[in-house]
């Protein structure tokens, strides 16, 4: 997950935010790999990962394309380009992966030069997503595909049995994020992907949603993502001023690892997290 240089997200190119990206990628890995397989991208094809973040999605895409397939990842920040290059350096697919610094709204590529464009958890950060989608369409060959993945965070369940508290936390997070997304929160913008696709001229689009579901005992990837990204970052101290004292105390009791009521060590814990893949084909 990444964004264009003028659209900051989280801690930007910092080490802390690189950790956020990798934790999310690893948490969703089985479902994202399945989504990539279900796309049935042509063997040996050439595609883009716009906003490639730490490079894991680009790697999984390359692995799905066979020995002749190639993936070019774009990131606006040089630091993340270097991280992505290091991330894949030991993979057998490394020779088929390239990472460049670039803006997804102005790709430095010729018209009709690639077979597909993948953009994961990025489009909602771009102030003009229609402009970005039209740029994706420009570089696609006739019959090429635009593929937008969005994590449906507003529909996620991380506090089973505490729906009122979870709704309060989600509303507070939406309010906090409006300073970045403008009048619409990031969560709202995620849900408007088909609207943007339609406005860009992608009249026929397809949706497939994958449910990330984890249960106790949690594996390391799930626990790291839920604890460090959801509980500590998304629902951490930055929301304290947006919640009443009772809600904050309940959040602390359930989400802090040293609390007797800590959820993630309970044998009955589970979580649900929908991930949607929107795709459309460019007319020939």
Features from the language model and the residues they span:
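Conserved alpha-helix/loop element of class I SAM-dependent methyltransferases that forms part
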Residues: 26-43, 60
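Class I SAM-dependent methyltransferase SAM/SAH-binding core
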Residues: 46-50, 54-106
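A short acidic, Gly/Pro-enriched loop at the edge of an enzyme's catalytic core
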Residues: 105-116
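A short SAM/SAH-binding and catalytic strip from SAM-dependent methyltransferases
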Residues: 115-130
């Amino acid at each position: 997950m990444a964004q264009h240089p003028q659209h900051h997200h989280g801690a930007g190119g910092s080490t802390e935010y690189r950790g956020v990206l990798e934790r999310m990628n690893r948490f969703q890995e089985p479902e994202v790999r399945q989504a990539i397989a279900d796309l049935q991208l042509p063997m040996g094809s050439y595609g883009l990962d716009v906003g490639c973040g730490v490079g894991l999605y680009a790697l999984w895409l390359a692995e799905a394309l066979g020995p002749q397939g190639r993936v070019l990842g774009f990131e606006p920040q040089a630091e993340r380009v270097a991280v992505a290059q290091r991330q894949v350096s030991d993979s057998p697919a490394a020779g088929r992966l390239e990472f460049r610094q670039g803006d997804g709204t102005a790709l430095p590529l010729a018209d009709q030069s690639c077979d597909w464009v993948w953009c994961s958890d990025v489009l909602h950060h771009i102030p003009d997503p229609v402009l970005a989608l039209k740029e994706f369409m420009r570089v696609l060959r006739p019959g090429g595909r635009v593929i937008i993945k969005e994590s449906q965070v507003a529909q996620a369940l991380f506090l089973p049995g505490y729906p009122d508290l979870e709704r309060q936390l989600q509303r507070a997070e939406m309010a906090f994020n409006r300073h970045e997304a403008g009048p619409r929160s990031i969560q709202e913008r995620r849900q408007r992907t088909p609207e943007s696709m339609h406005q860009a001229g992608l009249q026929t689009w397809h949706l497939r949603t994958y449910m990330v579901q984890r249960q106790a005992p949690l594996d390391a990837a799930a626990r790291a993502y839920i604890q460090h990204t959801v509980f500590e970052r998304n629902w951490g101290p930055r929301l304290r001023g947006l919640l009443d004292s009772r809600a904050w105390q309940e959040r602390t009791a359930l989400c802090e690892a040293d609390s007797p009521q800590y959820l993630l060590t309970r044998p009955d814990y589970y979580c649900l997290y929908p991930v949607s893949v929107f795709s459309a084909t460019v007319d020939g």
